[in-house]
Structures are given as C-alpha cells and as structure tokens.
A protein has these predicted regions:
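Domain-level detector of nuclease and nuclease-like folds
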Residues: 1-169
Length: 169
C-alpha cells in the first residue's frame, strides 16, 4: 500500500527475470528487501535495458559479478505510511574477472524522469560509484588490481555500439 498512487514503481534490485532458475528464488525476489521506489521511466526504460544487457553479458562472458543498489542522500523523500525512503539514484557495478585483463564498469542513474539516454552516458568508473555509496566494492583484491579496475572505464569493452538506448513503452 505504500507504493499505491505514489508515482513510483516497485523496482527490483535483483530482477525477477534473473530468478527463473528456481521457484523459491522467484518467490524471494518479490520480498520488499529486494524492492525500492523507482521512477517508472527509469524502471521501464534504460534500467530495463541495463538489466537485459547484464543478462547477455553474463551469458557471453560465462560469469560476471554484479552488485546493484540504491544511492541515498540527505534530501531523500519518503512514500506511504511506512515512510519508505526514495533513493536519489541507483547503481550497478560489474566485474568480468575472466577476461584478460579483467574489466569492471560502474553505472549511475538518477531516480528521475530524465529520459532514455544511453548506457554509455551512465557508465562511470567504479570509483565514482564508491564515492556516491561509500562502499568499497573490490576491497578483497590486491590494491594494484583494485586501482586498475576501479579508476577508469572503457565503454567500448562492454557496449557493442548500437546505441544501447531504450525509450519506455
């Protein structure tokens, strides 16, 4: 009921489309611990495009590490009687550790009616996502490898160049 008439979708952090491997996983992905208020144009647009591409990359590369979450700020609003906090933005961090050399990418998306944009336009170094979230994503890696992976991003190593845009239906 917190989401009803709030203007926000129930955005899944781990997409339901990724949970088809198990009825239990599919059921679990609908718990509110996996759901956050997400602007409809973001959720049904470029965020969906990124979810689909992430699935493709996982198949193409054999395995990738994926971390997804909200970015909160001091000015966040809330919705509903339970005062569900509305994130200012969302992130996704990817690591393909099997490629030589390994590669990583961060994505940051404002939780607004920004429009479709491109995946390349939202791709940032992992360091930028760490600055926005306060999370050290690759802390277990040797510092030299961590610095190499987090300090820059090469969109051409991830994106095929077909624009990677999506206008919501």
């Amino acid at each position: 009921s917190d989401y009803r008439r709030s203007g926000y979708d129930r955005g899944h952090l781990a997409p339901a489309a990724d949970m088809r491997f198990s009825p239990e996983a599919m059921r679990d992905c609908f718990y509110y611990s996996n759901i956050v208020p997400q602007h409809p144009r973001l959720n049904r647009g470029i965020w969906l495009t990124l979810e689909n591409r992430t699935r493709q990359w996982a198949k193409e590369y054999g395995a990738i590490f994926i971390t997804t979450g909200p970015v909160y700020s001091s000015g966040d609003t809330t919705i509903g009687n339970n005062q569900v906090r509305v994130p200012a933005a969302f992130y996704k961090v990817l690591l393909d550790y099997r490629s030589r050399p390994p590669k990583a990418a961060g994505f940051l998306f404002p939780n607004t009616d920004e429009g479709p944009g491109t995946l390349a336009g939202h791709m940032v170094p992992v360091d930028a996502v760490e600055a926005a979230t306060g999370i050290d994503f690759f802390a277990a890696l040797p510092d030299s490898v961590e610095a190499l992976l987090e300090g820059s991003v090469n969109p051409a190593s991830w994106l095929s160049g077909e624009g990677e845009t999506h206008e919501p239906q």
